[in-house]
Regions:
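Conserved Rossmann-fold NAD(P)-dependent oxidoreductase catalytic core, especially the SDR/UDP-sugar
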Residues: 38-85
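SDR active-site strand-loop-helix element
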Residues: 11-15, 51-57, 61, 113-115
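Short alpha-helix in the Rossmann-fold core of NAD(P)-dependent oxidoreductases
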Residues: 29-36, 40, 52-55, 91, ...
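Conserved cofactor-binding/catalytic machinery of classical short-chain dehydrogenase/reductase
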Residues: 10, 35-38, 50, 80, ...
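NAD(P)H-binding glycine-rich loop region in Rossmannoid oxidoreductase-like domains
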Residues: 1-31
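Conserved beta-loop-beta element that borders a ligand/cofactor-binding pocket
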Residues: 55, 98-121
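Active-site helix of classical SDR
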Residues: 87, 91-94
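Alpha-helical substrate-binding/gating segment
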Residues: 118-121, 126-135, 141-166
Length: 166
């Protein structure tokens, strides 16, 4: 019931089709864009003042580009152009645009996290020897990754810090 929503202070929205090739392009785009819009709309209508969203490194257009695409500059930062070629990256750009619009309309804190390739602790021993031997294997991820524990800390910091807007 809606009466219980008054006790919710923050929404952390990470639900989505998490990458390409898990669903059709149209389903990936529609699922991710509509779910983000619906979360933003419902949360702001209920007066929730903080929303944390999962965006992605794929917004830069390097990760799932057809052929080799290089970033326009390195290190890549939040001001780097977002020009993805794939439905997943496009859906994340659309989510960021919606988040900025909702933030401007409501004044809520809405934080979109452009998360890099998430690595679990056991994957260091399994994957990283190959990455060290051939760094080009990480090119599509702009040589970046985030440890699951660091991602958890990032979300925790977002929960603790108020007033950043978008």
């Amino acid at each position: 019931p809606l009466g219980h929503a008054a006790r919710v202070f923050v929404i952390v929205h990470f639900a989505a089709v998490p990458r390409i090739l898990l669903a059709t392009d149209a389903k990936t785009y529609a699922t991710n864009v509509l779910s983000t819009y619906n979360v933003l709309e419902a949360a702001t209508r209920l007066g929730i003042r903080k929303i944390i969203l999962a965006s992605s490194e794929t917004t830069y257009g390097v990760c799932f580009a057809q052929g080799e695409r290089r970033p326009q500059y390195v290190p890549v930062d939040e001001d780097h152009p977002t020009v993805p070629e794939d439905s997943y990256g496009m859906s994340k750009v659309a989510g960021e645009v919606a988040a900025r619009c909702f933030q401007a309309r409501t004044g809520a804190d809405i934080y979109s996290l452009r998360i890099n390739n998430v690595i679990e602790p056991h994957e260091y021993a399994e994957l990283f020897p190959a990455f060290v031997a051939d760094p080009s294997l990480r090119r599509r991820n702009i040589f970046a990754y985030i440890d699951t524990r660091d991602l958890a800390q990032m979300v925790q910091r977002c929960l603790e810090v108020d007033g950043l807007g978008y």
